[in-house]
Amino acid sequence: MFVCLSPGGQSLTQGEVAKDKLLVGTVDGIFAFQKRGGSWESQGTMVPGKHFSSIVFEPSSQALFGGTYSSEIYASADLGKNWERRDSGIGDKEIYSLASQSVNGKPRVYAGTQPAHLYYSDDLGKSWTELPALRQVPGVEKWTFPGPPHQAHVKSITFHPKDPNIIHVAVEVGGFLKSTDGGKTWTTIDNINPDAHRVLIPTNDPSKLYGTAPTTNCGPETPAGFCVSSDGGASWKSMTPRDFRIGYVDPFFVHPGDPNLLFVAGAKTGPGTWRKLHTADSRIARSRDGGKSWDILTGGLPEHIRANIEGMAMDAWNGGYAIFAGTTDGDVFYSEDEGNHWQTIIKGIGPVSKSHHYSNLALEGQEAHH
């Protein structure tokens, strides 16, 4: 099994022992690494030249899937040695997110796109079927995005750990959406900033629903930041203060064995400011009490992180866990002591970047995106 690190793909792996294989989705392909001793050694690049949004390892079939911002899904049936296009039925839509779950004992893979549509495949990506009701919720005509072409996208997909019919997606910018019938019908979850970034149901406490949305573009009365709902999304509570160090909260996860152990990362301000400030000023934070209090993690990390952290992954095993964080500078930070101390295990590969975010922090003269 692989640890998959990408902006819109799998963020949690579990098993009896720690994983020693890492795949990083970047603007220039999937970079593969193998852990030997205390270092992560390069194993080459898969599908070079393609900007990957998402990577998923489907455990029952041992298949790998990668989605790109150039409207392709690639699949590998031999642990990454060979890849082939498998996106028939999706059309010319950018792939922003991938996820998988078991439905009736068989693997089902989901793909979220820009414009915001949701698809699924029951044959390991050989054919895809749309769940069209996602676009039949009230207000879909208001879905948008700050940067051109001003089209919303499905940024995040999550499933109920005990009921595969319950699916949540985050549409940026459109809101958090919920289905209780496997995607046949959808409702929009209100009472939270509709600039939806991520949504997650923790495996060990499915009564909770977590979501992230930036505090940088809404009033103080609107729940935003790192938020929790205990009633399926009917009401939300912000678990981070308005002056939280991370205003543009994005990737996060919950430890599968401890629902109170949370990690979140992101920039101080939104992408529209990065070019002017020449920095995203990103950070990683940890809560041990379900979000009541937070620690900004600094041990071993650069004093100032200019790049944004756009992907995080956790590998949990019996007796421990490791955290990986990928940046728009192509660096990967790593901790195996609960985030107290970090190492930069990979430097200067392709940027780990949602769409064009990395260009906001790149050389002058390039077009800025949001």
Predicted segment positions?
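Extracellular glycan-interacting surfaces
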Residues: 1-370
